[in-house]
């Protein structure tokens, strides 16, 4: 078994770039514990649609935080970071290399740069705001935020309803701009000098094709049944899992609201758009990561 020259390994990248397969090979070679850094793979409901490792793959190396959380839970970055700290201690005591793998840039940013201490938003405030803004266009949310919190509005895209709602929730709950909390960060969990961080960067056209093909393969392998089971749970549509890529459109088809081919087209479109955002986030928010073609990444990690 090879010996690592670092105390933690981070494998990030866009969806469908081959992160999980690479991380598993490296865990086998380096004696690693795989720690999930994907905000959808933490949930147990959608193994297929979230591309979570299979049960057979999970037997090949220790896996942590994969399918660990019920879909009814709003599992925040702070909760994930707390769990990650505990697993890091487990890895150290076992003499195993912690290997973080996933596509959620915010998780990696929290690990390597620290996390802002943002107060929890009470459920009643969140529910009232969600009810008031249901069906409201993202551009209208941005206009409201611009009027009430221009500093934060300037940082957010008018096409990003999730982050716009988050900014409005914090404003409602605290009377303060989310920007004021983001300016104060706790210390990073990992020492950047002792961490190897890699961002997989496949060629864009090939990645888009792989995304489309994988989405079709997921549907053929049982994703429809997964989504139907999730739909029957009657969870709040605002929960993170209910907004997973493809889920709203597949549910819309299952409820007879849109044709099947339209649901599939929109699911693929949203996943490709997510991949573009992952590239953008990494470029601007993850400065310590080395970008590598997938075929070069294993050698880079082992060097």
From Swiss-Prot:
The keyword Iron does not apply. Its EC number is 2.5.1.75. Its cofactor is Mg(2+). The keyword Nucleotide-binding applies. Catalyzes the transfer of a dimethylallyl group onto the adenine at position 37 in tRNAs that read codons beginning with uridine, leading to the formation of N6-(dimethylallyl)adenosine (i(6)A). Belongs to the IPP transferase family. HAMAP family: IPP_trans. This is tRNA dimethylallyltransferase. The lineage of its organism: Bacteria, Pseudomonadati, Pseudomonadota, Alphaproteobacteria, Hyphomicrobiales. The gene is miaA.
């Amino acid at each position: 078994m090879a010996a690592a020259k670092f105390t933690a390994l981070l494998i990030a990248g866009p969806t469908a770039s081959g992160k999980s397969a690479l991380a598993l090979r490296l865990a086998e070679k380096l004696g690693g514990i795989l720690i999930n850094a994907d905000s959808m793979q933490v949930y147990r409901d959608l193994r297929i649609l979230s591309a979570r490792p299979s049960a057979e793959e999970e037997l090949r190396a220790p896996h942590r935080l994969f399918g660990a959380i019920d879909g009814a839970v709003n599992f925040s970055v702070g909760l994930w970071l707390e769990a990650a700290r505990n697993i890091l201690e487990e890895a150290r005591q076992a003499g195993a290399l912690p290997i973080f793998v996933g596509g959620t840039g915010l998780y990696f940013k929290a690990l390597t740069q620290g996390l802002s201490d943002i107060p929890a938003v009470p459920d009643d405030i969140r529910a009232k705001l969600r009810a008031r803004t249901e069906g409201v266009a993202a551009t209208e949310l941005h206009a409201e935020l611009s009027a009430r919190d221009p500093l934060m509005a300037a940082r957010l895209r008018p096409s990003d309803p999730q982050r716009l709602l988050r900014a409005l929730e914090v404003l409602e709950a605290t009377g303060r701009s989310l920007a004021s909390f983001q300016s104060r960060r706790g210390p990073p969990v990992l020492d950047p000098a002792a961490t190897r961080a890699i961002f997989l960067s496949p060629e864009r056209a090939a990645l888009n094709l792989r995304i489309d093909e994988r989405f079709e393969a997921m549907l053929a392998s049982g994703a429809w049944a997964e989504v139907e089971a999730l739909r029957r749970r009657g969870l709040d549509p605002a929960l993170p899992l209910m907004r997973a890529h493809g889920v709203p459109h597949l549910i819309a088809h299952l409820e007879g609201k849109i044709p099947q081919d339209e649901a599939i087209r929109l699911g693929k479109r949203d996943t490709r758009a997510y991949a573009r955002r992952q590239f953008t986030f990494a470029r601007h928010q993850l400065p310590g990561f080395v970008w590598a073609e997938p075929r070069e990444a294993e050698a880079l990690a082992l060097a």
